[in-house]
Amino acid sequence: MKTASPSKKSLSRILPHLLLALIVSIAAIEPNLAHANGGLDKVNTSMQKVLDLLSGVSITIVTIAIIWSGYKMAFRHARFMDVVPVLGGALVVGAAAEIASYLLR
């Protein structure tokens, strides 16, 4: 009489689910593992630094784009439609930094 043994294919399908169940069980038993003993504070600090950097970069890019557009219109006699792509790009960069700031706070 043969006993049923799991094949390698069925074991490879079940293994990820078993590992996930094990991780969830350990996290439920030991909630301090989920908080990583202060690791969340480190992540928040790092993300705040990234947000500050993005804000500074976006302010710089928007300022340079406005100065460049003004110079081109004043001294090179460019039409407004000639500088719209640059101003639009600056608007997108500035908005992206602010949207990221809004989403991460």
From Swiss-Prot:
| Family matches, as InterPro entries | TrbC/VirB2 (IPR007039)
Cellular component terms, GO, for this chain's entry?
plasma membrane
Q: What is its main location?
A: membrane
Q: Name one Pfam family in it.
A: TrbC
Renumbered to this chain, the signal peptide range is 1-36
Lineage: superkingdom: Bacteria
UniProt KW Chloroplast keyword: no
Its annotated compartments are: Cell membrane
Q: What are the protein's UniProt keywords?
A: Cell membrane, Membrane, Signal, Transmembrane, Transmembrane helix, Virulence
Induction comment from the UniProt entry of this chain: Specifically induced within macrophages by phagosome acidification. Induced at 37 degrees Celsius in minimal medium, suggesting that nutritional stress is a regulating signal.
The topology of this chain with respect to the membrane is: Multi-pass membrane protein
Q: Where are the transmembrane segments?
A: 50-70, 83-103
The family classification in the record reads: Belongs to the PtlA family.
Protein task: The VirB system could be required for the establishment of the replication niche in the host.
Q: What else is known?
A: Transcription of the operon is maximal in early exponential phase.
Q: What is this protein called?
A: Type IV secretion system protein virB2
User: Which species?
Assistant: Brucella suis biovar 1 (strain 1330)
